[in-house]
């Protein structure tokens, strides 16, 4: 299991952009990797709602439900009108089926066995999975927090979710899996 991760919703975007200079590119590449126009989307680690906002710009008819383990982030996302539930990725997923399960910068907080368990549960309930996250790479850009961040190699994460790496730069990757 990953450790509990805490960020201030008021300063999150500023801090994440300072820590991850390619944050906005990662967001765009993740959304570009969605293989079809999804109807029902489950977002893991919704945070302040930035990814959901971008998703709904691209897919305005989609229904997005978000999960986050931080009450402050849940509150902030709800202020944006997003349906968000307070839950950890280790908890049972809300009832599917989901057209798409999507996560940006959240899954790396799980250790390898937690990632594999999550991907098994996602496969059972969704048509596709798209992840944009920090991975182990030769070049380290993002600062990692010991006991909180557990990145793995992109090829390993892709294998665990039966997917493939569709974009990789520095220590970031977008991974897509389809289960149709």
Predicted regions and their residues:
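Class I SAM-dependent methyltransferase Rossmann-like catalytic core
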Residues: 6-24
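Class I SAM-dependent methyltransferase SAM/SAH-binding core
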Residues: 44, 48-91
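C-terminal alpha-helical "lid/dimerization" subdomain adjacent to the S-adenosyl-L-methionine
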Residues: 131-175
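A short, conserved alpha-helix within the catalytic core of class I
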Residues: 110-121
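Hydrophobic adenine-recognition pocket in adenosine-nucleotide-binding enzymes
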Residues: 106
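Conserved alpha-helix/loop element of class I SAM-dependent methyltransferases that forms part
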Residues: 21-37
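A conserved beta-strand element that flanks and buttresses the S-adenosyl-L-methionine
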Residues: 102
């Amino acid at each position: 299991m990953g450790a509990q991760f805490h960020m201030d919703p008021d300063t999150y975007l500023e801090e994440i952009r300072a820590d991850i200079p390619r944050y906005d590119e990662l967001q765009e590449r993740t959304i570009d990797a969605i293989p079809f126009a999804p109807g029902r989307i489950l977002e893991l680690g919704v945070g302040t709602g930035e990814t959901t906002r971008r998703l709904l710009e691209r897919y305005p008819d989609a229904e997005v439900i978000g999960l986050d383990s931080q009450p402050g982030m849940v509150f902030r996302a709800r202020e944006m009108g997003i349906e968000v539930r307070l839950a950890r990725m280790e908890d049972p997923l809300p009832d599917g089926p989901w057209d798409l399960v999507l996560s940006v910068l959240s899954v790396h907080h799980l250790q390898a066995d937690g990632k594999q368990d999550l991907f098994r549960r996602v496969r059972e309930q969704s048509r596709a999975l798209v992840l944009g996250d920090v991975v182990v790479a030769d070049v380290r850009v993002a600062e990692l927090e010991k006991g909180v961040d557990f990145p793995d190699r992109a090829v390993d994460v892709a294998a665990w979710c039966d997917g493939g790496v569709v974009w990789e730069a520095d220590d970031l990757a977008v991974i897509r899996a389809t289960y149709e």
